[in-house]
């Protein structure tokens, strides 16, 4: 009987933890887990372990949390594990060539896009923002470039008009977890045929920033509606009204025209705001110190605050 692959898993957030759970459920031999150092979180700024570390500890898997993998001592520690394969999912540290070369079968990565489209840090949100009709997960053999390695397996899923960054994230985490298990089995059996990426088709999913979440009402309503969905649950689009920050959790295309940012209509159905082209109906908002509410609930108690003729973003 062939020996099971000795797998080292490297990942940090919940997206990665779901991949680790799938490998454990499939009975894979995880000899160690690499994850980012514990970070301060919450109001008390207590050091919190990553979701991947929490899962590894539950399963008594050794956890390593180096600040960098460029350090010869950290590389020696990894080499001592004698891994056949390293599975990397949203780890957050760059793997130098010396690390990529250590496992017998190299390192594979689960990336939340249909490569070569949306290489980089925020593929889920950028796909929604751009109006893509589908997304997916690509499992690839890692190389030194950013998400440039040969593709081993792809799984796709349609992007619906209701999808948010959060809903698509959750779906891709599930798809990716199954895909990684399938890829590991195929690698062990030697049945995978790597497909080289066409660099001419590559696009880059730049990291999200809070500055991008400030709504520019001169943009077309169609673009802003996609941005609001893409940036939910983080960083959440926002604007200002009456000197207060207004977080916009949900919106849909509305009717009407006017100066960008002008409130055209307010009703329990939504707050209709003019854009550079068309209008948006804001349906779920959050005021400072409050929680997200359907606009109907806000309208009942603060009708005068959302009067037509007022302008957002000033």
UniProtKB/Swiss-Prot annotation:
GO terms for molecular function: methionyl-tRNA formyltransferase activity. Keywords: Protein biosynthesis, Transferase. It is an enzyme of class 2 (transferase). It holds the Pfam family Formyl_trans_C. Gene3D superfamilies: Formyl transferase, C-terminal domain, Formyl transferase, N-terminal domain. One of its GO terms (cellular component) is cytosol. It catalyses: L-methionyl-tRNA(fMet) + (6R)-10-formyltetrahydrofolate = N-formyl-L-methionyl-tRNA(fMet) + (6S)-5,6,7,8-tetrahydrofolate + H(+). Its EC number is 2.1.2.9. The keyword Protein biosynthesis applies. The keyword Transferase applies. (6S)-5,6,7,8-tetrahydrofolate binds at residues 113-116. Belongs to the Fmt family. HAMAP family: Formyl_trans (MF_00182). PANTHER family: METHIONYL-TRNA FORMYLTRANSFERASE, METHIONYL-TRNA FORMYLTRANSFERASE, MITOCHONDRIAL. Attaches a formyl group to the free amino group of methionyl-tRNA(fMet). The formyl group appears to play a dual role in the initiator identity of N-formylmethionyl-tRNA by promoting its recognition by IF2 and preventing the misappropriation of this tRNA by the elongation apparatus. This is Methionyl-tRNA formyltransferase. The lineage of its organism: Bacteria, Pseudomonadati, Pseudomonadota, Gammaproteobacteria, Pseudomonadales.
